[in-house]
Structure formats: structure tokens, C-alpha cells
A protein has these predicted regions:
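Short, positively charged and aromatic/hydrophobic N-terminal segments
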Residues: 3-13
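Hydrophobic alpha-helical segments at protein termini of multi-pass membrane proteins
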Residues: 26-29
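Cofactor-binding active-site loop characterized by glycine-rich and histidine/acidic residues
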Residues: 40-43, 50-181, 199-205
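Short, ordered loop/turn segments at secondary-structure junctions
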Residues: 84, 190-193
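Active-site flanking residues adjacent to catalytic metal/cofactor-binding acidic residues
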Residues: 162, 189-190
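Short, proline-centered helix/strand-breaking motifs
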Residues: 183-187
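Short beta-alpha connecting loops at secondary-structure transitions
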Residues: 193-199
Length: 205
């Protein structure tokens, strides 16, 4: 087991850590408040049956997105995640109205109303979904990173997953290839403690 020493790693890094000022903290708080209210509104209209299909909210996980967005270069970096994917594209620059329209099934949505809650997508903003299969986005994230490396493009791919995805074989296979090929990818596990309903304490790995 390797112990991660952030200070030592920072001294060795080619990329200096961004300073976190009071203004940055306030921006994070503002973003997180907006994202929470956005999700709460979706929950309300879902109960009213105005949004069809499934609805997986991001409530309680906003800080992960706020912090990781701060480290990103939005001009070159890319993002891919699972089915809790309503607010990430907003953080990447997608118009919130387009995200809401997608959940309402309108042609003005990010996927022309055909993707729905779990399939928000905007290549123009470097956001590659929203995927309904548990762990399905993990090898795709590696593929996006591989394409950038192969074509000599700048950028890092951030691939988010929940704790339920770590039981998928594709995760371990992807991690192995990402290390062997030295892919420009960051894999982030957002452990909410329950995956979709099973406590981590009752889960076998």
C-alpha cells in the first residue's frame, strides 16, 4: 500500500497547486447552492410526473464536482460520469435550460430530448455523458484519454464513478491499461455509502 503524501507530491509536480482564496470558496458555495436547487427542482417535477424515466440526483456530492472543476482546464480537459449527471455539464458550461429541456424531452435539450435524465451530453463543452450502465463510463473515459494522447492533444479526462461501480470488472481492466499506457486520466470514486441502495458495509468486493 502506498501512502499519498500531498505535500511531497506537490513539490515533485510539474503543475503548481492552484491557490484557494476566499473568493474561490465563495464561488464553490454559490455553484453548490445552484446545483442543489436545480436538483431539488427536478425532484419536484419528477414527483409531478413531468419528467419520465429514472431520476438519479447528485444531492450531497456537490463538493466533489466543485473542487475538481477548479483543477480543470475547461478549454482542453474532458469529463465523463455515470447517471447522476445533471449538474456536471452545467459546471462545464452547458446552459442549465438545455439540461432541463433534455429531462423534459424537448428538442432544445442537450441530446435533442432523446437521452433523458441519464444521458446528458455535450461534446462542445467536453462533457461525454451520462451513462446508464453501472461502470460503463469507466473504459470510455480511458478511451477518451487515449484518443487525446494518440493525437497529441492537450487535456486530461476526469472520469467519475460511484462506489457501486468498483465491483465491475471493467474498472480493474481499465485501471490496468491506464497505468500501462500512462493515460492522461483521473478516476474519481464518489462514495455515497449506498451505491443505489446497498450499504457499503453489506457489500462484498
Amino acid at each position: 500500500m502506498r501512502i499519498f503524501d500531498a505535500q511531497k507530491r506537490q513539490k515533485q509536480s510539474r503543475f503548481p497547486m492552484k491557490k484557494i482564496t476566499k473568493e474561490v470558496y465563495l464561488k464553490w458555495y454559490e455553484d453548490m447552492q445552484f446545483w442543489r436547487r436545480f436538483e431539488d427542482k427536478l425532484a419536484a417535477v419528477y414527483i409531478q410526473q413531468k419528467v419520465r424515466g429514472f431520476l438519479h440526483l447528485y444531492n450531497g456530492q456537490e463538493a466533489v464536482l466543485a473542487g475538481s472543476l477548479h483543477a480543470m482546464d475547461l478549454e482542453h480537459d474532458k469529463m465523463i460520469t455515470a447517471y447522476r449527471n445533471h449538474v456536471q455539464p452545467i459546471g462545464m458550461g452547458v446552459d442549465p435550460k438545455a439540461v432541463m429541456a433534455e429531462l423534459y424531452g424537448k428538442v432544445t435539450g442537450t441530446s435533442k430530448g432523446m437521452g433523458g435524465s441519464m444521458h446528458i451530453f455535450s461534446k462542445e463543452h467536453g462533457f461525454y455523458g451520462g451513462h446508464g450502465i453501472v461502470g460503463g463510463q469507466i473504459p470510455l473515459g480511458a478511451g477518451i484519454a487515449f484518443a487525446d494522447k494518440y493525437f497529441g492533444r492537450k487535456g486530461v479526462t476526469l472520469c467519475y464513478m460511484g462506489d457501486g461501480a468498483v465491483r465491475q470488472g471493467s474498472l480493474h481492466e481499465t485501471f490496468n491499461l491506464a497505468m500501462l499506457w500512462k493515460l492522461p486520466a483521473v478516476f474519481i470514486c464518489e462514495n455515497n455509502g449506498y451505491a443505489m441502495g446497498t450499504s457499503v458495509a453489506r457489500t462484498s468486493y
